[in-house]
């Protein structure tokens, strides 16, 4: 689950096809990310947040989790809010992760 499953490919920006359900989203722009089996994998540390080797997922209702094995922590924040990648939800996610 926490191993690169897409070889040399990288996670690209998520472009919406249903704007009333989701905004376009790109988590940690400019940083290399991979897909594992069921999660996004970080290949480098994110500023103010998780370590390289961390895994994460996001759901349509602005539900998010991450696991950082190097630091021995995990975080879960669940909202029921549309559209996905709502700017206020992303700001709350960022503040929550920085606080942990």
Where are these regions (language model features)?
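Catalytic loop of the DD-peptidase/beta-lactamase superfamily, centered on the K-T-G motif
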Residues: 1-100
């Amino acid at each position: 689950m926490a191993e690169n499953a897409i070889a040399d490919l990288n996670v690209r920006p998520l472009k919406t096809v249903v704007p009333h359900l989701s905004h376009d989203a790109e988590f940690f722009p400019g940083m290399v990310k991979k897909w594992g089996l069921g999660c996004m994998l970080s290949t480098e540390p994110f500023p103010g947040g998780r370590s390289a080797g961390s895994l994460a997922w996001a759901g349509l209702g602005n539900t998010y989790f991450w696991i950082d094995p190097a630091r021995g922590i995990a975080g879960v924040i669940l909202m029921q809010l549309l559209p996905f990648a709502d700017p206020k939800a992303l700001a709350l996610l960022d503040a929550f992760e920085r606080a942990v």
